[in-house]
Design a protein with these regions (language model features):
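N-terminal signal-anchor transmembrane alpha-helix
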Residues: 1-42
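Cytoplasmic-side transmembrane-helix entry/capping segments in multi-pass membrane proteins
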Residues: 8-9, 36-38, 60-69
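Membrane-water interface at the C-terminal end of transmembrane alpha helices
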Residues: 106-128
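Individual transmembrane alpha-helices with interfacial aromatic-anchor signatures
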Residues: 94-109
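Canonical alpha-helical transmembrane segments
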Residues: 42-58
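Interfacial non-cytosolic loop connecting adjacent transmembrane helices
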Residues: 82-97
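Hydrophobic alpha-helical membrane segments
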Residues: 48, 64-83
Length: 128
């Protein structure tokens, strides 16, 4: 068993599940979308992104691209959340949180593509 591949797979899967945990629930209900889950998703996705820099294969480049998309989407979601909460004194509203969750859903899709690539790479691996 290769420890590097275990750690890589762990962070790819963790990035997808933490992001999914943030986006699940009613789109316009702010009580169902914890901001700390969004921040955790950003941190885990950045760690997964850093781990993907070492792979120089074509599938590694696609892994890196999916991670870049996910991180950019999550950073945009966090920036939007910060803007909405700091621009007025009221709590975040339904339409505002739905914009944040929509961006995080885009990142979840990128994480799903990364998971599919990881499984495809694992299935096609042949022992020597």
């Amino acid at each position: 068993m290769n420890l590097e591949k275990v750690i890589f797979g762990f962070f790819v899967l963790l990035a997808a599940t933490v992001n999914f945990g943030f986006v699940v629930g009613d789109l316009d209900n702010p009580d169902l979308h914890n901001i700390w889950e969004l921040y955790a998703a950003i941190v885990v996705n950045v760690v997964a992104l850093v781990l993907k820099f070492g792979d120089r294969t074509q599938i590694g480049a696609t892994h890196l691209a999916t991670s870049l998309v996910a991180v950019l989407q999550l950073l945009a979601a966090a920036s939007l959340y910060i803007y909405f909460t700091s621009s007025h004194a009221e709590p975040i509203t339904g339409p505002e949180i739905s914009s944040v969750v929509s961006l995080a859903c885009g990142a979840a899709l990128a994480n799903f593509v990364s998971l599919v690539l990881l499984v495809a790479e694992t299935v096609s691996f042949r022992r020597r």
